[in-house]
Amino acid sequence: MTPTPDAPAAADAATGAGWLARRRGALARVALAPVAQAIGRVERVADGIAFVSGLEDTMLNEVLRFEGGVTGFAHTLDEDLISVVLLDPDAGVRAQTAVARTGAVLEVPAGPQLLGRVVDPLGRPLDGGAPLDAAHTLPIERAAPAIIERDLVSEPLDTGVLIVDALFTIGRGQRELIIGDRATGKTSLAIDAIVNQRHSDVICVYVAIGQRASAVRRVIDAVRRYGAPERCVFVVAPAACAPGLQWIAPFAGFSIAEYFRDRGQHALVVVDDLTKHAATHRELALLTREPPGREAYPGDIFYVHARLLERAAKLSAALGGGSLSALPIAETDAGNLAAYIPTNLISITDGQIVLDSALFAANQRPAVDVGLSVSRVGGKAQHPALRAASGRLRLDYAQFLELEAFTRFGGLTDARLRAQITRGERIRALITQPRFRALRTLDEVVLLKALAAGALDAMSPDLVAPLRERLPAWLDARIAALTPALAPPRDWLADDAALDALAESVGELIERIAADAAHRATAGMPAEDAAGDIGGAFGGEQARGDADRDADHGANREVSREVSPEASREVSREVSREVSHEADRDAAADAARVAGRAPGRAEPDRAAPRAMPDGPPRAQADGDRASASRPRPDARGDAARTAPSPQGGAEVNVNAAANVDAEAEARHKR
């Protein structure tokens, strides 16, 4: 039995009276009252800081909007005034300008739509692209994960740089400081780490603070050319922008990276650099009349950087297992690691990679100081095969550097020490790596195993660079030959026997590289031209010349075998007497020539050139005088070089006479 609808309700629905009544009841329940909005006034403005009064309830870091559309955030809160850091040019902000609260804190857009884009710290595009869809926003100031929310750092973050991956391993979720003097390759090392993530699942965020626009453009172009820009976000606050944007830039970069970390992905943040960020914080603090401390920095500078870098972490499996790694960059002055900001950052981070200006000047790139650099995670996040292969690398290299310092005072006679010096030179050549020449983990393990086995000891250090360039293709070919058809993928790093076999094959590659180098040295041309220019007419002439020289040497060896030792000694005595007489005659001729009485030589007619007209005759006369001033070949010297043998009349090649002739010519020139 179906229920019948209520007649009044049906009538109301038909006429719409019920809907109207309900709407009237809802409107009656709304409390209509005026809403008070506090409006403050600008008391004064200077250097990107506005001092505002009348907004006592403002929160710290709250966004304030000025009349005319300029925005800023509350930096310090005093009883009477609020120091507001402007995020836009202060044009239009004057005294008595109205200021209103927004009730919101600074936020930045986050999400996949930022990948491949260049934005400012507020998410505004700088690459000329379309505006970003702010479907997801995150506050720039977020709390760091608690201890219970973190997990151990146990996965490596491969940088492709051998010295970093082997000696100072960086783990996913680690904070590793890159520190060094100006122009020592700090940014280059960080960009190499970003470029190497093109084959990984890591999202990279590059934050530029106070950098020149041209330098930032070079970084972006390098990532677009060698890396995977579709997996990178560039947050740029150049030196020409407002100090407020430079101050919030690293916080915005971390918030963008945290979006991916919180979803179980892995992210890497490069902050370039925190020294300029500290200078910006000091500038804002001094402008807002905060009391200065050591090196004029405010007392909270340590807390500012600590709360920023503590946001890098490896989350637990319950939270998705994502990670956020940080590579902050800091600049030192004349290598002073004991300065205020460097010591703060070293104590906050999980290790540091120190770049030395002397090593950089010696053309060692990257110029990593092995003695001062450290990773406090290290082997816990290193691949087991790489950890086993690089066990003694740091110790051997440190001992080599110490021995090398002693060799400057004298030679080494101990064979063991000489072998250690040789091994150290190969290690230094191996860890010297050009930019954008990243190595795979397999390449690094095989190289270190070959080094430990002594395969590199016999090769020249100059051949290490060709070995590093040709090794990946060589290993790929070897793996393809060792892998059966339709075989499942194989983890070569987990097979010690396979790694040993690949390391042994490096010896064959070294022999090929050495043979190619010898061939190029013999041909006297670069590698790219040697293959194409040896053949043909030039190659035939060179081959014929080599054959003639070989025939001459063979004939001389045959003559030497035909002459008896007694005949050779007799010829040597005859040649010595002849050379002695020749030397006496040359000395007498030199003395006569100096005195103007050279025998057998007519004095040149010096009046003849004056009678000659200008042109070829004068040039010919000058050429004659020049040829006369050059030493002429001596017939007797030539005869002395080939002396008859008393047994058989064979000719003997005598080198001693040639040496005496050379000494006589040298005396003549003096």
Curated annotation (Swiss-Prot):
This is ATP synthase subunit alpha 2. GO terms for molecular function: ADP binding; ATP binding; proton-transporting ATP synthase activity, rotational mechanism. Produces ATP from ADP in the presence of a proton gradient across the membrane. The alpha chain is a regulatory subunit. It catalyses: ATP + H2O + 4 H(+)(in) = ADP + phosphate + 5 H(+)(out). Residues 527-670 are annotated as: Disordered. It comes from Burkholderia pseudomallei (strain 668). It is a peripheral membrane protein. The keyword Translocase applies. ATP binds at G180, D181, R182, A183, T184, G185, K186, T187. Residues 543-588, 621-639 have a biased composition (Basic and acidic residues). Keywords: ATP synthesis, ATP-binding, Cell inner membrane, Cell membrane, CF(1), Hydrogen ion transport, Ion transport, Membrane, Nucleotide-binding, Translocase, Transport. It is found in: Cell inner membrane. F-type ATPases have 2 components, CF(1) - the catalytic core - and CF(0) - the membrane proton channel. CF(1) has five subunits: alpha(3), beta(3), gamma(1), delta(1), epsilon(1). CF(0) has three main subunits: a(1), b(2) and c(9-12). The alpha and beta chains form an alternating ring which encloses part of the gamma chain. CF(1) is attached to CF(0) by a central stalk formed by the gamma and epsilon chains, while a peripheral stalk is formed by the delta and b chains. SUPFAM superfamilies: C-terminal domain of alpha and beta subunits of F1 ATP synthase (SSF47917), N-terminal domain of alpha and beta subunits of F1 ATP synthase (SSF50615), P-loop containing nucleoside triphosphate hydrolases (SSF52540). It is an enzyme of class 7 (translocase). GO terms for cellular component: plasma membrane; proton-transporting ATP synthase complex. Residues 589-599, 640-661 have a biased composition (Low complexity). Belongs to the ATPase alpha/beta chains family. The lineage of its organism: Bacteria, Pseudomonadati, Pseudomonadota, Betaproteobacteria, Burkholderiales. It comes from the Bacteria. InterPro entries: ATP_synth_asu-like_sf, ATP_synth_asu_C, ATP_synth_asu_C_sf, ATP_synth_F1_a_nt-bd_dom, ATP_synth_F1_asu, ATPase_a/bsu_AS, ATPase_F1/V1/A1_a/bsu_N, ATPase_F1/V1/A1_a/bsu_N_sf. The record marks S373 as: Required for activity. CDD domains: ATP-synt_F1_alpha_N, F1-ATPase_alpha_CD. Its EC number is 7.1.2.2.
